[in-house]
Amino acid sequence: MPAFQSKKFRSAADMNSIGMRYRNLMNKHPFLMFGLPFLTVIVAGSFVLTPATAVRYERYDRKVRQMTKDEELNVRRSARKVDMKEEYYRLAGKDLDDWEQKRVKRLPGENDGLL
């Protein structure tokens, strides 16, 4: 009884096709099957995610902006004048010994610390 070959028979026309040449290259160089697609996904992901991170920084720039001179002057005028001695006496006059401890309501599922 003859032994069967482990390789499939492929005609010369099949061997010259682009798919067969690529399959032979993948067998010889596994980088083409695993490494190249991985690197392609990493590089493409970088290009796709760049605009997403730019949106984050643009939103921050809109929130934090430089004030104009007029806005700056209005903020300074509306601020309360602070004198160190007056602040000291105001804080010293407060009664810090008369206070009551109150529990804060916990969120659902949060440990309240009670046994």
UniProtKB/Swiss-Prot annotation:
Membrane protein topology class: Single-pass membrane protein
Database matches in Pfam families: COX16
Localization, UniProt: Mitochondrion inner membrane
TM region positions: 30-50
Any one GO biological process: mitochondrial cytochrome c oxidase assembly
InterPro entries linked to this entry: Cyt_c_Oxase_assmbl_COX16 (IPR020164)
Gene Ontology annotations for the cellular component aspect, listed alphabetically: mitochondrial inner membrane
Coiled coil region boundaries: none
Broad class of the protein's primary localization: mitochondrion
Transit peptide: first to last position: 1-11
Keywords in alphabetical order: Membrane, Mitochondrion, Mitochondrion inner membrane, Transit peptide, Transmembrane, Transmembrane helix
Protein family membership: Belongs to the COX16 family.
Free-text function comment from the UniProt entry: Required for the assembly of the mitochondrial respiratory chain complex IV (CIV), also known as cytochrome c oxidase. May participate in merging the COX1 and COX2 assembly lines.
PANTHER family: CYTOCHROME C OXIDASE ASSEMBLY PROTEIN COX16 HOMOLOG, MITOCHONDRIAL, MITOCHONDRIAL OUTER MEMBRANE PROTEIN 25
Protein's name according to its UniProt entry: Cytochrome c oxidase assembly protein COX16, mitochondrial
